[in-house]
C-alpha cells in the first residue's frame, strides 16, 4: 500500500554532525546570522531564526575532528535556506563574499 506525505508537511529541524562545533557556529551564527539558542555541554549547539527552539542542531557526538566525507559517499548534499526577502539573501551573500567563503 502506498502513502504520499501531505503537501503541507514541513521539516521542523535537522541535526548535522560536524567535526568542529566552533567552526560550525562561526559559519551559521557568525556569517549567516542564526541565533544560538542553547548548547549541550561542549558537544552540541542548537540554533534558530526568530526564537524557535532550534532549526539546526549541530553536534560532534560521533564526528569530532573527523575529516570531510569523501565526495562520492552517502550523506546530506544540499541544504537550502529560504530568506524572507531578496535583500536578506543579498546581505547573507555579501557576508559570505566579504569573508572569502568559497561559494560554488
What kind of feature is each model-predicted range?
Residues 26, 57, 68, 89-91:
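Short acidic, gly/pro-rich beta-turn/loop elements at beta-sheet edges
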Residues 40, 51, 72-74, 89:
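Generic structural signal for well-ordered secondary structure
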Residues 8, 18-22, 80-104:
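Vicinal oxygen chelate
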Residues 59-74, 80:
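Conserved donor-binding loop and adjoining core beta-sheet/short helix segment
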Residues 10-14, 75-79:
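Short amphipathic alpha-helical segments
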Residues 16-62:
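Core segments of cupin and vicinal oxygen chelate
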Residues 1-6:
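A detector for short, charged/polar N-terminal pre-domain segments
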